[in-house]
Amino acid sequence: KKLNSPNDVVVKSDGTIWFTDPLYGIMTNEEGFKSKSELGGNYVFRVNTKNQVEIVCNDFDKPNGLAFSPDENFLYIADSGASFGEKIHPERPHHIRKFKVTRNNYLEDLGVFTVINPGVPDGFSVDSIGNIYTSSWDSIQIISPLGENIGKIEIPEKVSNCCFGGSDKKTLYITASSRLYSIRLKINGI
């Protein structure tokens, strides 16, 4: 069957590929081409080392960004279900969930890790000590490995994603509505 609209991807050190596949890329022509889902839902998939595609999670409203912890024992996945165009429905999901990754690369749901306000989480990255740098509508929010909001990088427009780069991985690149921003940090990303 045809995938919906693969959104975000991460590769684990064992070669497995993990990605989110929400419906919103096919709901209108705005982000893709409007069409009917052949899968009938929103999923998180893993491509195993034999190139087989497997569903690893099927209970997200709108699965979005994802990233592993530095030791790859945990996988974080954003749910941006509260987002409807430029509107937010706060009763819908706007959080990041945390999963334990088992020895066989299956997921054990540990529940909501952190709620993102204002806006919804989209893409995010992790630094070398496990802090999450997540997009929100007005900034990059920095979340500790314990799920606490420990900082914010203000951006003058809506933020969609971020990643670490540069030769030392201490530059955080941030995509926003109309520009690409970068900021040097004292810590490196993974």
Per-segment meaning from a language model:
Residues 43-45, 95-97, 139-141, 179:
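A short loop-to-beta-strand structural motif that recurs across blades of beta-propeller domains
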Residues 49-51, 103, 146-148, 187:
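Short coil turn/linker residues within repeat-based beta-strand modules
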Residues 98-106, 185-190:
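Short loop/turn segments immediately following beta-strands, especially the blade-tip
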Residues 20, 78, 135, 173-177, ...:
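Residue-level marker for isolated small/hydroxyl-bearing positions within beta-strands
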Residues 161-190:
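Blade-level signature of beta-propeller repeat domains, shared across WD40, Kelch, NHL, RCC1
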Residues 1-17, 24, 38-43, 56-74, ...:
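Beta-rich, blade/repeat-based domains predominating
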Residues 51-55, 109-112, 148-150:
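Predominantly a core beta-strand signature of beta-propeller blades
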